[in-house]
């Protein structure tokens, strides 16, 4: 199977504070953890310890070529957005998996409506911030995905993402080796642990 391509949408990581009738959606997880992890911290080695960074460089963990595009939105926005499409300034890149992190719900809904036209097969919305999406909105988003013929996952948190009934999401977990951490212990004939092989790590690294 060919490599899956990712389209990632997130809020910008800024110190801006919301004013009246505004709300802030954090971009910290995407900017400081998930994206550096996908690119093996090559653009932000300071976010990883020296020992960790040195070890990671020995492994094929740079998936930069599999990121079709990244779309960043202002972290502070109106509480309600009447015309969410106006915030989509550029055409969506062709991709297989859409991942949204900390995006304004009105913009997220508009993105899910549009991603099928860009070839998207699955939507992953990790809920690192428990206040971001409430249960009723998650059900609405799942229904929208089903209407659009999209696979979906709303892990809370991202490191709880596990394989299930959806083929493309299962392939995403295998290709990018992220989700619920999984490892294998290697022992010698006497039962002593000689090595630990990590097959899947948490998306934050």
Regions from the language model: what does each represent?
Residues 198-205:
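Short, thiol/selenol-centered motifs that function as redox-active sites or metal-ligating centers
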Residues 132-149:
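Rossmann-fold NAD(P)-binding glycine/threonine-rich loop
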Residues 40-92, 106-109:
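A short, well-structured beta->alpha microelement
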Residues 1-54:
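N-terminal basic/disordered segments at the start of proteins
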Residues 120-132:
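ADP-ribose/adenylate-binding Rossmann-like module
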Residues 125, 152-156:
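General beta-strand structural signal in soluble alpha/beta enzymes
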Residues 8-14, 99-104, 126-129:
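Structural motif
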Residues 155-190, 194:
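Structured beta-strand/loop patches that form or line metal/cofactor-binding pockets in enzymes
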